[in-house]
């Protein structure tokens, strides 16, 4: 996803309030844990993109930020929502550097849920863990990890170790954790 970002002034409340009233989202771009720039993103463009994303996919989505003539690859590290309207009111981006590893949550997607043996026998499929915390280089980031539940029977479980993890991705979450279970109704 490509976003055009503009530089903004300081963190004064009055300035940030005006940015939001004009249809912008204040954001901070970090690099190596240090603040690189205060920027503004068009709220309509970001919200339109956000509405097309699958639940949980924002954590592993790589953005290309056009900032002052540079193309910066970044991940959303933090997102803040308005309490009542649930509008996005602030974003934090972390710049991705090719040779530096990054920690992130990659969503787990269950596949073949319709063909699951346990569900066909009247069971209920329950996904216990929805993300896997991993460490990888920016080039190895994947949008999601797949867990095939087709052969899962009644009262059976699949663990994180049952997920085929692509090369270059190192899990931080213990692999003996239960990811999916089929329970009797």
From Swiss-Prot:
GO terms for cellular component: cytosolic large ribosomal subunit. Pfam families: Ribosomal_L25p, Ribosomal_TL5_C. Keywords: Ribonucleoprotein, Ribosomal protein, RNA-binding, rRNA-binding. GO terms for molecular function: 5S rRNA binding; structural constituent of ribosome. One of its GO terms (biological process) is translation. InterPro entries: Rbsml_bL25/Gln-tRNA_synth_N (IPR020056), Ribosomal_bL25/Gln-tRNA_synth (IPR011035), Ribosomal_bL25_b-dom (IPR020057), Ribosomal_bL25_C (IPR037121), Ribosomal_bL25_long (IPR001021), Ribosomal_L25_dom (IPR029751), Ribosomal_uL5_bac-type (IPR020930). Part of the 50S ribosomal subunit; part of the 5S rRNA/L5/L18/L25 subcomplex. Contacts the 5S rRNA. Binds to the 5S rRNA independently of L5 and L18. This is one of the proteins that binds to the 5S RNA in the ribosome where it forms part of the central protuberance. HAMAP family: Ribosomal_bL25_CTC (MF_01334). Belongs to the bacterial ribosomal protein bL25 family. CTC subfamily. NCBIfam families: bL25_bact_ctc (TIGR00731), PRK05618.1-4 (NF004129). This is Large ribosomal subunit protein bL25. It comes from Chlamydia muridarum (strain MoPn / Nigg). The lineage of its organism: Bacteria, Pseudomonadati, Chlamydiota, Chlamydiia, Chlamydiales. The gene is rplY.
């Amino acid at each position: 996803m490509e976003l055009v970002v503009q530089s903004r002034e300081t963190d004064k409340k009055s300035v940030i309030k005006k940015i939001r009233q004009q249809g912008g989202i204040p954001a901070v771009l970090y690099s190596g844990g240090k603040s690189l720039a205060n920027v503004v993103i068009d709220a309509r463009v970001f919200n339109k993109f956000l509405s097309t994303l699958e639940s949980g996919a924002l954590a592993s989505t790589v953005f290309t930020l056009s900032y002052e003539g540079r193309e910066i690859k970044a991940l959303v590290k933090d997102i803040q929502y308005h309490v009542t309207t649930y509008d996005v009111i602030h974003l934090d981006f972390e710049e991705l550097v090719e040779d530096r590893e990054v920690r992130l949550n990659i969503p787990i997607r269950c596949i073949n849920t319709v063909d699951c043996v346990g569900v066909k026998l009247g069971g209920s499929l329950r996904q216990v863990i929805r993300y896997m915390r991993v460490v990888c280089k920016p080039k190895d980031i994947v949008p999601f990890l797949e867990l095939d539940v087709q052969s899962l029977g009644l009262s059976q479980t699949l663990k994180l170790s049952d997920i085929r993890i692509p090369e270059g991705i190192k899990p931080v979450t213990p692999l003996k954790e239960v990811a999916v279970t089929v329970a009797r109704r």
